[in-house]
C-alpha cells in the first residue's frame, strides 16, 4: 500500500491523532502505556431533548402529559416509570426497568440551565455550562490511554477532545482491516502480500529510522506534532492487528440495531486493550409537534438499543463497563398548539455498570416539573429550602470523574466542572 493511501485510510478511520506532544513525547506515552483493562465507558446521547415524564420521572397529571394517570405509574424497585408501551406492545418501559432496574441509577431534576440545543449538549457531556471542556469520554481516554488508536470512539453527540486524545469516527471493519494489515493486498487473505515478511520488516525499520531523523531535525512545535501524528498512525497498525482478532464481521454490524452497531467496534477495541470510551447517539427527540407519538418513537429506538447494547456488553466484556444516558435538556410541562412540547431546562440522566449502585433514584422535580434542590450532604430533596443545592450536569460529572478514577489527575483539574458542591457518589 502506498504511504499516501495508507495515511488517507488512517485519516478516514480517525487515526491521524491530534497529538498534544511531538514524537519524543508520543514515544514516551507509548512506552508507559499498558493494555487498558479498566471499565469501558459508553455515553449515550438522546439527541434533541428527551421527555423524562415519559420515562423515569413520571407525573401522571394534566397538563404535563396525556398518556397516563397517576395511579397507572409503574414501579421497578425504587424506580418509578411512565407506563408507556412501544412498537404495538413489542417493548415497554416496564420491560426495560424490570430488566435493568436492579442495576440502574436514575438522577432526576438535573438542571441544565439552558434551553439551547448546543449549550445543553455541551453541558450534559462536558460538565461545564459553556465551551472549553472536553467530553467526559475524551477526558477519561486522555488520562487512561492517551495514545491508543481507538481510545475514544464517537458516533455523535458532543465529542470535543481539547487535544487530550484522538477521536475515531468509524463503524466499518473493512476500513480498519486495511490499516491493520498494510502489507496485504487483500486484508482477508493472510498470504496475499505486497512484500515478503522480511522485506516488510526492513521497510518498517527504515521508516522508523527516517521518522526519527526527521523528528530530531525539527525545532518547531507544530512540525514536531506532525511527526508525532505520523508515528501514531504507523505504530497503531500493530494494535489494530490485535483489534481484528475481536472485531465482528461487517455483516454482523449491519444487522445490529443502530445503537449497538455504533458500539461494536469500540467493544472489540476494548477487548484488544485499545479502547476506553465511546459516544453513541439516538436522535428524534426534538418533538415540537405530535409529541406523544414522536417522543415514543424515539424512546423505543433508545430503549431497545440500550437493551441490545447492555446485553451485548454483558456477553463480550462481562460487568466491566459503564453506560451513561442523557440528553440536551427536557421538554416543557405543557403542550403547544401543535400538540408538541418545547425545550425545558430540567431533565434526567440514567446510568448503570461497574461501581454504580443500582435500584436507586437521586433528585426530583416538583409538580410543575421544576428541578428540586437537594441537601448537599444527604441528597434528600429539599423543596423551597434556601439551603438546597441543585443537581447540575457538573455535579454528575464530578461523581463520574471520581468513579472513573480521573478526578485528581492534572488533566481533570485543568478542566473543572461547574455547579455547586454536592456530595453525589454513585457507588
Residue ranges and their predicted role:
Residues 1-427:
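Ligand-binding pockets and gating/stacking loops
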Amino acid at each position: 500500500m502506498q504511504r499516501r493511501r495508507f495515511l488517507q485510510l488512517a485519516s478516514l478511520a480517525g487515526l491521524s491523532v491530534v497529538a498534544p506532544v511531538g514524537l519524543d513525547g508520543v514515544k514516551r506515552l507509548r512506552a508507559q502505556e499498558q493494555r487498558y483493562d479498566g471499565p469501558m465507558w459508553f455515553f449515550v446521547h438522546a439527541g434533541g431533548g428527551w421527555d423524562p415524564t415519559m420515562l423515569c420521572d413520571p407525573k401522571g397529571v394534566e397538563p404535563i402529559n396525556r398518556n397516563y394517570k397517576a395511579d397507572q405509574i409503574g414501579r421497578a424497585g425504587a424506580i418509578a416509570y411512565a407506563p408507556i408501551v412501544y412498537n404495538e406492545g413489542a417493548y415497554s418501559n416496564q420491560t426495560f426497568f424490570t430488566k435493568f432496574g436492579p442495576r440502574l441509577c436514575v438522577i432526576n431534576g438535573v438542571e441544565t440551565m439552558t434551553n439551547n440545543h448546543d449549550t445543553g449538549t455541551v453541558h450534559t457531556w462536558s460538565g461545564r455550562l459553556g465551551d472549553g471542556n472536553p467530553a467526559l469520554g475524551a477526558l477519561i481516554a486522555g488520562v487512561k490511554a492517551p495514545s491508543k488508536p481507538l481510545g475514544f470512539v464517537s458516533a455523535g453527540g458532543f465529542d470535543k477532545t481539547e487535544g487530550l486524545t484522538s477521536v475515531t469516527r468509524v463503524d466499518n471493519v473493512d476500513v480498519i482491516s486495511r490499516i491493520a494489515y498494510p502489507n496485504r493486498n487483500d486484508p482477508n487473505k493472510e498470504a496475499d502480500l505486497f512484500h515478503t515478511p522480511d522485506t516488510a520488516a526492513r521497510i518498517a525499520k527504515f521508516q522508523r529510522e527516517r521518522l526519527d531523523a526527521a523528528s530530531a531535525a525539527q525545532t518547531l512545535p507544530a512540525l514536531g506534532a506532525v511527526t508525532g501524528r505520523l508515528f501514531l498512525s504507523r505504530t497503531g497498525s500493530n494494535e489494530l492487528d490485535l483489534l481484528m482478532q475481536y472485531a465482528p464481521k461487517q455483516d454482523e454490524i449491519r444487522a445490529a440495531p443502530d445503537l449497538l452497531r455504533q458500539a461494536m467496534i469500540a467493544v472489540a477495541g476494548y477487548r484488544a486493550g485499545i479502547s476506553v470510551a465511546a459516544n453513541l447517539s439516538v436522535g428524534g427527540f426534538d418533538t415540537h409537534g405530535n409529541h406523544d407519538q414522536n417522543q415514543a418513537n424515539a424512546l423505543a429506538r433508545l430503549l431497545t438499543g440500550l437493551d441490545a447494547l447492555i446485553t451485548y456488553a454483558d456477553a463480550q466484556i462481562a460487568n466491566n463497563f459503564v453506560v451513561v444516558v442523557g440528553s440536551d435538556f427536557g421538554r416543557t410541562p405543557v403542550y403547544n398548539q401543535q400538540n408538541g412540547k418545547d425545550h425545558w431546562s430540567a431533565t434526567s440522566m440514567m446510568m448503570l455498570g461497574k461501581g454504580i449502585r443500582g435500584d436507586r433514584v437521586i433528585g426530583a422535580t416538583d409538580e410543575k416539573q421544576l428541578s428540586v434542590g437537594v441537601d448537599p450532604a444527604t441528597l434528600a430533596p429539599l423543596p423551597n429550602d434556601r439551603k438546597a443545592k441543585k443537581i447540575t450536569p457538573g455535579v454528575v460529572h464530578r461523581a463520574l470523574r471520581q468513579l472513573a478514577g480521573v478526578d485528581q489527575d492534572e488533566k481533570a483539574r485543568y478542566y473543572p466542572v461547574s455547579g455547586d458542591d454536592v456530595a453525589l457518589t454513585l457507588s
